[in-house]
Protein backbone atom coordinates (compact mmCIF):
# COMPACT_ATOMS: atom_id res chain seq x y z
CA UNK A 1 0.00 0.00 0.00
CA UNK A 2 0.91 3.67 0.35
CA UNK A 3 3.35 3.19 3.28
CA UNK A 4 5.63 1.09 1.08
CA UNK A 5 6.29 4.15 -1.10
CA UNK A 6 7.97 5.79 1.89
CA UNK A 7 9.52 2.66 3.41
CA UNK A 8 11.48 1.98 0.23
CA UNK A 9 13.37 5.26 0.74
CA UNK A 10 14.84 4.10 4.05
CA UNK A 11 17.42 1.64 2.62
CA UNK A 12 18.11 4.04 -0.25
CA UNK A 13 18.82 6.83 2.24
CA UNK A 14 21.08 4.60 4.35
CA UNK A 15 23.00 3.55 1.23
CA UNK A 16 23.38 7.21 0.19
CA UNK A 17 24.81 8.10 3.62
CA UNK A 18 27.34 5.25 3.45
CA UNK A 19 28.41 6.18 -0.09
CA UNK A 20 28.73 9.84 0.91
CA UNK A 21 31.03 8.97 3.81
CA UNK A 22 33.40 7.17 1.45
CA UNK A 23 33.02 9.13 -1.79
CA UNK A 24 32.81 12.78 -0.72
CA UNK A 25 36.03 14.61 0.23
CA UNK A 26 36.54 15.50 3.87
CA UNK A 27 36.44 19.30 3.74
CA UNK A 28 38.08 20.58 6.90
CA UNK A 29 37.77 24.24 5.98
CA UNK A 30 36.40 26.29 8.86
CA UNK A 31 35.07 29.82 9.03
CA UNK A 32 34.76 32.31 11.85
CA UNK A 33 31.68 33.88 10.24
CA UNK A 34 28.56 33.51 12.34
CA UNK A 35 25.51 31.88 10.84
CA UNK A 36 22.90 34.38 9.66
CA UNK A 37 19.99 33.22 11.83
CA UNK A 38 17.64 36.18 11.09
CA UNK A 39 18.24 35.87 7.34
CA UNK A 40 17.63 32.13 7.41
CA UNK A 41 14.45 32.72 9.41
CA UNK A 42 13.09 35.35 7.00
CA UNK A 43 13.80 33.12 3.98
CA UNK A 44 12.43 29.92 5.52
CA UNK A 45 9.18 31.51 6.71
CA UNK A 46 8.68 33.36 3.41
CA UNK A 47 9.16 30.25 1.28
CA UNK A 48 6.94 28.23 3.62
CA UNK A 49 4.09 30.74 3.30
CA UNK A 50 4.40 30.99 -0.49
CA UNK A 51 4.54 27.20 -0.92
CA UNK A 52 1.54 26.81 1.40
CA UNK A 53 -0.41 29.31 -0.69
CA UNK A 54 0.51 27.53 -3.94
CA UNK A 55 -0.37 24.13 -2.47
CA UNK A 56 -3.64 24.99 -0.74
CA UNK A 57 -4.92 27.63 -3.18
CA UNK A 58 -6.46 25.04 -5.49
CA UNK A 59 -8.44 23.61 -2.56
CA UNK A 60 -9.37 26.69 -0.55
CA UNK A 61 -9.81 28.97 -3.56
CA UNK A 62 -7.30 31.53 -4.80
CA UNK A 63 -9.32 34.44 -3.39
CA UNK A 64 -9.66 32.87 0.08
CA UNK A 65 -8.38 35.34 2.70
CA UNK A 66 -5.92 32.76 4.05
CA UNK A 67 -4.32 32.25 0.63
CA UNK A 68 -4.09 36.00 0.04
CA UNK A 69 -2.57 36.43 3.51
CA UNK A 70 -0.01 33.68 2.87
CA UNK A 71 1.04 35.33 -0.40
CA UNK A 72 1.15 38.82 1.14
CA UNK A 73 3.19 37.83 4.18
CA UNK A 74 5.41 35.54 2.11
CA UNK A 75 6.30 38.30 -0.36
CA UNK A 76 6.75 40.79 2.48
CA UNK A 77 9.10 38.30 4.14
CA UNK A 78 11.19 38.11 0.98
CA UNK A 79 11.54 41.90 0.98
CA UNK A 80 12.60 41.73 4.62
CA UNK A 81 15.11 39.03 3.72
CA UNK A 82 16.66 41.17 0.98
CA UNK A 83 16.72 44.21 3.28
CA UNK A 84 18.45 42.22 6.02
CA UNK A 85 20.98 40.58 3.70
CA UNK A 86 22.04 44.00 2.41
CA UNK A 87 22.38 45.30 5.97
CA UNK A 88 24.13 42.51 7.85
CA UNK A 89 27.90 42.01 7.80
CA UNK A 90 27.62 38.23 7.49
CA UNK A 91 24.72 37.49 5.09
CA UNK A 92 23.50 33.97 4.47
CA UNK A 93 23.39 34.78 0.75
CA UNK A 94 25.69 37.42 -0.65
CA UNK A 95 23.23 39.10 -3.02
CA UNK A 96 26.06 40.28 -5.28
CA UNK A 97 26.05 36.73 -6.67
CA UNK A 98 22.92 37.66 -8.62
CA UNK A 99 24.79 40.42 -10.48
CA UNK A 100 26.19 37.66 -12.69
CA UNK A 101 23.56 37.53 -15.44
CA UNK A 102 24.40 33.99 -16.55
CA UNK A 103 23.91 32.75 -12.98
CA UNK A 104 20.59 34.57 -12.54
CA UNK A 105 19.32 33.76 -16.04
CA UNK A 106 20.02 30.07 -15.57
CA UNK A 107 18.07 30.09 -12.30
CA UNK A 108 15.14 31.79 -14.06
CA UNK A 109 15.22 29.21 -16.84
CA UNK A 110 15.22 26.44 -14.24
CA UNK A 111 12.19 27.97 -12.53
CA UNK A 112 10.31 28.28 -15.83
CA UNK A 113 11.24 24.80 -17.00
CA UNK A 114 10.06 23.06 -13.83
CA UNK A 115 6.92 25.19 -13.81
CA UNK A 116 6.08 23.84 -17.27
CA UNK A 117 7.24 20.25 -16.77
CA UNK A 118 5.19 19.79 -13.61
CA UNK A 119 2.04 19.92 -15.81
CA UNK A 120 3.09 16.56 -17.20
CA UNK A 121 4.01 15.22 -13.77
CA UNK A 122 0.59 16.11 -12.36
CA UNK A 123 -1.86 15.51 -15.22
CA UNK A 124 -0.67 12.41 -17.06
CA UNK A 125 -1.38 10.03 -14.14
CA UNK A 126 -5.00 11.29 -14.18
CA UNK A 127 -5.17 10.70 -17.93
CA UNK A 128 -3.77 7.18 -17.69
CA UNK A 129 -6.12 6.07 -14.92
CA UNK A 130 -9.30 8.08 -15.53
CA UNK A 131 -9.34 8.14 -19.34
CA UNK A 132 -7.44 5.04 -20.46
CA UNK A 133 -8.54 3.00 -17.43
CA UNK A 134 -5.07 1.87 -16.33
CA UNK A 135 -4.58 0.60 -12.80
CA UNK A 136 -1.83 2.26 -10.68
CA UNK A 137 0.73 -0.43 -11.54
CA UNK A 138 0.14 -0.12 -15.28
CA UNK A 139 0.30 3.67 -15.04
CA UNK A 140 3.56 3.41 -13.11
CA UNK A 141 5.18 1.33 -15.85
CA UNK A 142 4.24 3.97 -18.43
CA UNK A 143 5.39 6.89 -16.26
CA UNK A 144 8.84 5.34 -15.83
CA UNK A 145 9.61 6.57 -19.37
CA UNK A 146 10.49 10.10 -18.24
CA UNK A 147 13.09 9.23 -15.56
CA UNK A 148 14.45 6.51 -17.86
CA UNK A 149 15.12 8.98 -20.67
CA UNK A 150 16.41 11.54 -18.16
CA UNK A 151 18.94 9.09 -16.71
CA UNK A 152 20.20 8.20 -20.19
CA UNK A 153 20.53 11.71 -21.59
CA UNK A 154 21.85 13.60 -18.55
CA UNK A 155 25.37 12.09 -18.63
CA UNK A 156 25.56 12.65 -22.38
CA UNK A 157 24.49 16.29 -22.13
CA UNK A 158 26.91 16.83 -19.23
CA UNK A 159 29.85 15.66 -21.32
CA UNK A 160 28.72 17.63 -24.35
CA UNK A 161 28.32 20.82 -22.31
CA UNK A 162 31.90 20.50 -21.03
CA UNK A 163 33.06 20.40 -24.62
CA UNK A 164 30.68 22.72 -26.47
CA UNK A 165 29.22 24.94 -23.74
CA UNK A 166 25.96 24.96 -21.84
CA UNK A 167 23.85 27.59 -23.60
CA UNK A 168 22.73 25.88 -26.79
CA UNK A 169 22.39 22.46 -25.19
CA UNK A 170 20.07 23.92 -22.54
CA UNK A 171 18.04 25.61 -25.27
CA UNK A 172 17.89 22.34 -27.23
CA UNK A 173 16.64 20.56 -24.11
CA UNK A 174 13.87 23.10 -23.60
CA UNK A 175 12.81 22.86 -27.26
CA UNK A 176 12.66 19.05 -27.04
CA UNK A 177 10.68 19.31 -23.79
CA UNK A 178 8.27 21.79 -25.38
CA UNK A 179 7.76 19.44 -28.33
CA UNK A 180 7.09 16.58 -25.93
CA UNK A 181 4.55 18.64 -23.99
CA UNK A 182 2.91 19.78 -27.22
CA UNK A 183 2.68 16.17 -28.39
CA UNK A 184 0.42 15.53 -25.39
CA UNK A 185 -2.22 17.70 -27.10
CA UNK A 186 -2.67 14.89 -29.66
CA UNK A 187 -3.68 12.29 -27.06
CA UNK A 188 -7.22 10.93 -27.33
CA UNK A 189 -9.51 8.61 -25.41
CA UNK A 190 -8.19 5.80 -27.64
CA UNK A 191 -4.44 6.40 -27.30
CA UNK A 192 -2.22 3.44 -26.42
CA UNK A 193 0.32 2.93 -23.65
CA UNK A 194 3.08 2.85 -26.27
CA UNK A 195 2.00 6.23 -27.61
CA UNK A 196 2.04 7.82 -24.17
CA UNK A 197 5.35 6.12 -23.35
CA UNK A 198 6.97 7.58 -26.47
CA UNK A 199 5.78 11.09 -25.66
CA UNK A 200 7.09 10.79 -22.11
CA UNK A 201 10.45 9.60 -23.45
CA UNK A 202 10.66 12.78 -25.52
CA UNK A 203 9.95 14.95 -22.47
CA UNK A 204 12.48 13.05 -20.36
CA UNK A 205 15.15 13.44 -23.04
CA UNK A 206 14.48 17.16 -23.14
CA UNK A 207 14.81 17.48 -19.38
CA UNK A 208 18.08 15.55 -19.49
CA UNK A 209 19.54 17.78 -22.18
CA UNK A 210 18.45 20.90 -20.28
CA UNK A 211 19.13 20.12 -16.65
CA UNK A 212 22.81 19.13 -16.65
CA UNK A 213 24.05 22.04 -18.81
CA UNK A 214 21.84 24.53 -16.97
CA UNK A 215 23.11 23.37 -13.57
CA UNK A 216 26.67 23.55 -14.89
CA UNK A 217 26.06 27.15 -15.95
CA UNK A 218 24.77 28.00 -12.46
CA UNK A 219 27.62 26.33 -10.58
CA UNK A 220 30.23 27.51 -13.09
CA UNK A 221 29.27 31.14 -12.54
CA UNK A 222 29.13 30.99 -8.75
CA UNK A 223 32.18 31.76 -6.61
CA UNK A 224 33.72 28.65 -5.09
CA UNK A 225 32.82 29.94 -1.63
CA UNK A 226 29.14 30.08 -2.70
CA UNK A 227 28.83 26.57 -4.18
CA UNK A 228 26.64 25.43 -1.29
CA UNK A 229 24.29 28.39 -1.69
CA UNK A 230 24.18 27.93 -5.47
CA UNK A 231 23.19 24.29 -5.05
CA UNK A 232 20.49 25.30 -2.57
CA UNK A 233 19.12 27.90 -5.00
CA UNK A 234 18.85 25.21 -7.69
CA UNK A 235 16.74 23.14 -5.30
CA UNK A 236 14.61 26.15 -4.33
CA UNK A 237 13.87 27.00 -7.97
CA UNK A 238 12.94 23.39 -8.67
CA UNK A 239 10.65 23.17 -5.64
CA UNK A 240 8.89 26.49 -6.31
CA UNK A 241 8.56 25.66 -10.01
CA UNK A 242 7.08 22.23 -9.37
CA UNK A 243 4.74 23.41 -6.62
CA UNK A 244 3.56 26.43 -8.59
CA UNK A 245 3.27 24.38 -11.77
CA UNK A 246 1.11 21.72 -10.13
CA UNK A 247 -1.17 24.41 -8.71
CA UNK A 248 -1.42 26.14 -12.10
CA UNK A 249 -1.92 22.86 -13.95
CA UNK A 250 -4.73 21.84 -11.60
CA UNK A 251 -6.46 25.20 -11.92
CA UNK A 252 -6.23 25.35 -15.73
CA UNK A 253 -7.21 21.72 -16.21
CA UNK A 254 -10.22 21.96 -13.89
CA UNK A 255 -11.42 25.17 -15.57
CA UNK A 256 -11.08 23.77 -19.09
CA UNK A 257 -12.68 20.42 -18.16
CA UNK A 258 -15.65 22.28 -16.67
CA UNK A 259 -15.93 24.48 -19.77
CA UNK A 260 -15.79 21.47 -22.08
CA UNK A 261 -18.29 19.40 -20.06
CA UNK A 262 -20.69 22.31 -19.63
CA UNK A 263 -21.15 21.61 -15.94
CA UNK A 264 -19.16 21.33 -12.72
CA UNK A 265 -18.00 17.95 -11.41
CA UNK A 266 -16.83 17.15 -7.90
CA UNK A 267 -14.36 15.52 -8.03
CA UNK A 268 -13.24 16.90 -11.35
CA UNK A 269 -11.92 13.53 -12.57
CA UNK A 270 -15.53 12.26 -12.57
CA UNK A 271 -16.15 14.32 -15.72
CA UNK A 272 -16.64 12.50 -19.06
CA UNK A 273 -13.40 11.24 -20.67
CA UNK A 274 -13.78 13.58 -23.66
CA UNK A 275 -13.93 16.58 -21.32
CA UNK A 276 -10.90 15.34 -19.36
CA UNK A 277 -8.91 15.02 -22.59
CA UNK A 278 -10.01 18.48 -23.79
CA UNK A 279 -8.80 19.97 -20.51
CA UNK A 280 -5.53 18.07 -20.83
CA UNK A 281 -4.98 19.46 -24.34
CA UNK A 282 -5.40 23.07 -23.20
CA UNK A 283 -3.21 22.60 -20.13
CA UNK A 284 -0.41 20.94 -22.11
CA UNK A 285 -0.55 23.66 -24.75
CA UNK A 286 0.05 26.21 -21.99
CA UNK A 287 2.87 24.05 -20.57
CA UNK A 288 4.60 23.92 -23.96
CA UNK A 289 4.34 27.70 -24.20
CA UNK A 290 5.83 28.14 -20.72
CA UNK A 291 8.69 25.86 -21.68
CA UNK A 292 9.46 28.03 -24.70
CA UNK A 293 9.32 31.17 -22.53
CA UNK A 294 11.95 29.56 -20.27
CA UNK A 295 14.31 29.67 -23.27
CA UNK A 296 14.42 33.49 -23.23
CA UNK A 297 16.73 33.96 -20.19
CA UNK A 298 19.10 31.28 -21.50
CA UNK A 299 19.06 32.83 -24.97
CA UNK A 300 20.13 36.17 -23.47
CA UNK A 301 23.04 34.66 -21.55
CA UNK A 302 26.61 35.70 -22.24
CA UNK A 303 28.55 33.54 -24.68
CA UNK A 304 31.76 34.41 -22.82
CA UNK A 305 30.52 32.60 -19.71
CA UNK A 306 30.18 29.44 -21.80
CA UNK A 307 33.71 29.84 -23.09
CA UNK A 308 35.00 30.17 -19.52
CA UNK A 309 33.24 26.94 -18.50
CA UNK A 310 34.70 25.10 -21.52
CA UNK A 311 38.19 26.40 -20.70
CA UNK A 312 37.88 25.41 -17.04
CA UNK A 313 36.61 21.90 -17.86
CA UNK A 314 39.47 21.34 -20.33
CA UNK A 315 42.12 22.43 -17.82
CA UNK A 316 43.91 19.37 -16.40
What are these regions (language model features)?
Residues 1:
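Short glycine-rich hinge loops at helix-strand junctions in the catalytic core
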Residues 4-16, 40, 51, 63-73, ...:
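12-transmembrane solute porter fold
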Residues 18-31, 53, 83, 89:
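C-terminal ends of transmembrane helices
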Residues 26-41, 88-93, 307-313:
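Flexible cytoplasmic inter-helical loops of multi-pass small-molecule transporters
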Residues 42-47:
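Alpha-helical transmembrane segments
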Residues 56-61:
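Short, hydrophobic transmembrane alpha-helix segments
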Residues 264-278:
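Short, membrane-exposed interhelical loops at transmembrane-helix boundaries
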Residues 270, 299-316:
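Intrinsic disorder in cytosolic terminal tails and internal cytosolic loops
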Amino acid sequence: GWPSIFYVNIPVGILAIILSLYALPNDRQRTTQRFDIPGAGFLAVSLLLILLALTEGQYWGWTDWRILAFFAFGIAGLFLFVWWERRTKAPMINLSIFSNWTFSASLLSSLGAFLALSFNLFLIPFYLQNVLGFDPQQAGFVLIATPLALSLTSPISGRLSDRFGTRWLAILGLIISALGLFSMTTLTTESTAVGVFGRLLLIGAGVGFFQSPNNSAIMGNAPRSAFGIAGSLISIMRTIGQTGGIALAGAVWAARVTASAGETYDPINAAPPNALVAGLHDAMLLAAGLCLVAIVPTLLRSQRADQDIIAESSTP
